[in-house]
Amino acid sequence: MKKLWYLTIALVLILAALSVPAATAEEEPTQYTSGDYRYTLRLDETAAIAKYTGSASELSIPDTLDGHAVTAIGDKAFASCGSLTSVTIPDGVTSIGNSAFYSCDSLTISTLPDGVTTIGDYAFYSCNSLTSVTIPDGVTSIGDYAFCFCRALASISLPDSVTTIGDYAFYFCGSLTSVTIPDSVIEMGSNPFLECDNLTQIMVSPDHPVFATVDGVLFNKSEKKLVCYPYAFTQTSYTIPDGIRSIGDRAFSSCNALTSITIPNSVTSIGNCAFAACNALTSIVIPNSVTAIGDGAFSPCTSLTSVTIPNSVTSIGNSAFENCRSLRSIIIPEGVTSIGDNAFSLCRSLESVTIPDSVTSIGNRAFSSCISLTNVNIPDSVTSIGKNAFSLCTSLANINIPDGITSIADNAFGCNSFTSITIPDSVTSIGDGAFDGCNFLTSITIPDSVTSIGDGAFGDCNSLTSITIPDSVTDMGNNPFAGCKNLTRIIVSPDHPVFATIDGALFNKPEKKLVCYPCAFSQTSYAIPDGITSIGEKAFGSCSALKSITIPDSVTSIGDGAFDSCKSLTSITIPDSVTSIGDSAFYWCTSLASITIPDSVTSIGDGAFDSCTSLASITIPNSVTSIGDRAFSRCTSLTSITIPDSVTSIGSSAFHSCKSLASITIPDSVTSIGDGAFDSCKSLASITIPDSVTSIGDRAFSECTSLASITIPDGVTSIGYGAFESCDSLASVSIPESVTSIGNRAFSSCESLTSITIPDGVTSIGDGAFKSCDSLANVSIPESVTSIGKYAFAECSELLTLTVVRNSWAASWCKENGMNYTYTDALDWLKQ
């Protein structure tokens, strides 16, 4: 769980680092190039380094570039320079920009000149190898997350010039054992030493004007705030001193030794994530003086079984107790007006909750996935219940919706154990999936006040047998009753202004759309009435009795998932009037053996025929220009298919796992083959890729175990990740001169491949590109190659010698990696 917490925090930090809004083109300063440096000119005609493009390991940045003195290291200037081990910055530099050395994984030492005054946010973020850094006397501020994730940083000396230390500046510096805060520091952000695993000592002079340590814990004296409780402290209990008014953001975060904490009556606020991930903490009493509990304050305290919230508290922050999975009950005090988003979500042991009359709003996902919660009384004061507020509360059997509620939010009550629900007359709208998955809900009354019902609002309510749509409903999303397996009756008055039922099926009259065909109808065939122009999304979803459907010539579109999971449907004729087949339109129609697609259709949606396991053949008309992602994925009976000349692209996983597909014709019109397009087509013995194709996606032909040979056309420039991985029968492959890169694992585990000629022009061979090619005996590498990934030829048991050009980069690589090699000079290579 702690690893998950770390990963979550790391992801949040990374996203924060990368989410700087891009400047518009006119705002971007002109960049100049000098050797391996790109730079911009400042107002005083000095240079700010914008980007280093070299690959040096030990680097001394020059004093000048094209005669301009270097005075600044710009934002992200050296970010992700993985080869950089040490850097010396010239004396004229005064500022280190945001993310300047971000993720320089190999950087072990950095010397900052005396003139530097500011170290930007994320400046040395994730420099995992950085063991020491000297901060000169001129530095006044250290930015947010400046040395975050510098795990090897064992010591840091802060000079007397520093006045400001940013939020989480030394977060996760796992080797740091002690730190001294100089008297000059007057401002400190949220816990700068968060999760410093070995930090046991924070030193502050007794005369410090702002900060103090008491029993090793860092406080802000002027604000009377607890800033940091050292992560490595081993004591199991702690009492916060009297007089402290606030607990800072993440002050105790991840202090896993603590089982109990005593908070004095002087404390009025608990900061964001103040006790986050204190996983040994079993109980806590919040004193009457506290008025606010911050976002994520106790999330996730996985051992917390009880918490006392006093009446003084008026707000409970977002995620305040999220994932406190041992918490069994909670009483929200009078005075609280809102329950934040995710406030108690994932509290899996929570059995009861008391919500007072003062509460007016319950946030999004506030109690989501509280799987032990059996009963909730929502007071009449509540006027807003957020999206997913009680979703996946699988034990919740009943709940009252107060009269003040005007809308039921999306997925608000996806509660499996609901048996009945009363929707008050105040409600005007029912959101998407509002009661989705309420499997035991046998009946529901929609009041006359409701004007709109969202997509799948009552989807998969499998005990629902009938429903009445009041005349007030004028707007209805895609099949609100999709997957209701026992629904036999939808009741609509003859005078309804918008909707009507014909032979039990629900229609939208103005739109001439079939909205819902009840799942539990027992007839095996159905003819859609003439005049209907569209079949709505999931209109026939999970209608397992239907074997045949007649679609009239008036229909022009078939919606997404229209016939999803119609497992008895054996055949269907699509009329010439239809122009589009929606995503997943016939998904999992496992009995569908044949289908005729008319010339009027121009696109086949994503997953349109996915998992139609009985579909043996299909003709795609010349009108179709694109085949969507997963369009025919897992059509395991499909033996052959002809793609017409009109098609220009084959989507990702379009024919994935079509295990019986033995042949396919790709026309000259196709320019791209998507990722995994023919992945695991185990019967595919041959395929001709036309010259028009310029890109072959990742894993496009992986695990095509019968494929014996392949010719890659001249227009292709790169072979994607795992493109032909595990093609066990592949004995020969022709790579054209247009290819410049061979992706990671591109031909990995091609056990029958005996030789490969890599053409001149290829510059990179990816990690594991030919790994485990057991029969590979001959490989020639041209002079153009400048990069060979790890394990590119690993576990090639027959490969004894590589053929390389004398004095080439590949020859040096062979020497460095202990590979046997023989020479062919560049002239011989060109003759080949």
Regions found by a protein language model. Name each.
Residues 25, 828-832:
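C-terminal cell-surface addressing/anchoring modules of secreted/extracellular proteins
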Residues 75-77, 97-102, 120-125, 143-148, ...:
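Consensus positions within tandem repeat domains that build extended binding/scaffold surfaces
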